[in-house]
Amino acid sequence: MKQINIFDEAIEECCSNPITGFYRDGFCRTDELDRGLHVVCAKVTDEFLNFSKSRGNDLSTPRPEFNFPGLKEGDSWCLCAERWKEAYECGFAPKIYLNRTNKKALSVIDIDILKDFALDLI
C-alpha cells in the first residue's frame, strides 16, 4: 500500500537513527495493525518526553531488550496521532515535519494545527 504525506506526495523518511515507525523502517507508515496510528513525524523535546512519560509512555528510557536507545531532545520519531493531539491540547506538542507525516494524521488532527507546528514549511 502506497503511503502519502499530508500533501498527497510520497512520504519521506522520518528517522533512521534511532530507527522509527510502527514497522521500524524509518517511515511513519501505518495500516490496520497499527492501532496507535504512529503517523506524526515529530522532533521531540524534553518537555514532550516528560509529558509522554507522565501519561505512561516513557520514550526516553533505553530498552535494550527492544533495541531501543531511548529518545533525547532533537530526535525525530513517529508519534501516535492521538498522543500528539493530547500534547497539543496540554501545551507540550513538539514541532513536526509535514513531508514526513502520514496523511492519516488528518483523521485525528486538523491540517491548520499541523501547519502551525511545521518545521518544513517555507
Summary of predicted features, one role per range:
Residues 84-107:
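Short, compositionally biased
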Residues 102-122:
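Glycine- and charge-enriched low-complexity intrinsically disordered segments
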Residues 1-47, 119-120:
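Extended boundary segments
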Residues 38, 73, 94:
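Residues that flank catalytic or metal-binding motifs in active/ligand-binding sites
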Residues 43-58:
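Short, basic/aromatic beta-hairpin or loop at an interaction surface
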